[in-house]
Amino acid sequence: GYFYWMLIRSFGPVPILPDEGVDYTKDYDEIAQPRNTYDECADYISNELVKAAAQLPDDRGLQEVARPTRGAALALRARVLLYAASPLYNGKAPSEVLTAMVDKEGRQLLSSTYDEVKWARAAAAAKDVMELGKYNLYVVYAKENGDIAEPATITPPDDNGTFHSNPWPKGWQNIDPFLSYRSLFDGTAIAYGNDELIYTRGSNQGNEGIDIMVIHQLPRSQGGGYNYHGITQKQCDAYYMKDGADCPGMNSMYQGREGYTDPSRYDVEARPSGVITQNELAEYPELGSMGTGVSKQYAAREPRFYASVGYNGSIWHMLNANTDKGEKTNVQIFYYRDKPDGYKAGAYWLHTGIGIKKFVNPHDRADSEKTYDVSRVQAKTAPDIRYAEV
């Protein structure tokens, strides 16, 4: 079931092979079979995962941390059914997609009819995981003091309800949303004993792990990384403001384009202009003490934004720097054309102009003189399925 899920994620609907397999010694024409529909694939995967859940253990030991459990099978099932209920696969795909997604006989592989029942099945599958009673969200509790890399807790905004004033788990009054989220990905939270982590595959592929990905994310000029991986403006716009509102100007670059004629898909309000000055810095504690020069479109955003996005002017801590060799810590990095990590920086420039800090630990630092040297990169756990997603 898991590998069929990986296939349909990458290629869309695929042929479902018979349980007894096929005789690969026969001619292709004898064993070839058409693709199944997306719904058929999702139903098959769902059924296989139910069978697997009945046979898998409830818990994983220290030596089996990357092995699946009953909860992992049920959580993956919930994800598969959620995707099947989503607009693209539930009657809301654009006509050009429906037309293109057919088999060689012309059979439509994506449903053109909306079915509310799909959402009910996905919700019921998620409830199956929740009712196991084994998982909780990972939190870091609030602290009054800190430094630039491990900042003191910024009080979350008033939600006009009771969530902001109640302690965890009924509210966020005594937790740090920023560190709670960042720690899940940057290696602070280890796999074993993390009640939010439902499934991780581990890492056994040499130079294809998260540590190598981090080296590709780190800035070149000061971090020794490759400065390659970036996100798009659309991904950046997906993060909310700290009060939960959409960011001003969200997706405005698509206004008038095909598929964006619905005004609800973009925000017509202008993006904030100008940059943060020293006199204004105290108004934006989320930027830290080195936030001058940052575009105001990156200010007052939600905690996940600052744990994930390497925006222009963000601080890369790199606490494992070798100061005896002149390496620096807590460096403000800009990706403008005339900057060391910008377009003119030879081969090592960030193509989108917006970097990625997710999975980057404050201590992580690379060495530009050593290819893929991860000795100063914190080991990470791949959070393939988290309880927060359920």
Task: Label every model-predicted segment.
Residues 139-389:
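Elongated scaffold/linker segments in the mid-to-C-terminal portions of large proteins
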Residues 2-216, 374-387:
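Structured, solvent-exposed acidic/aromatic patches
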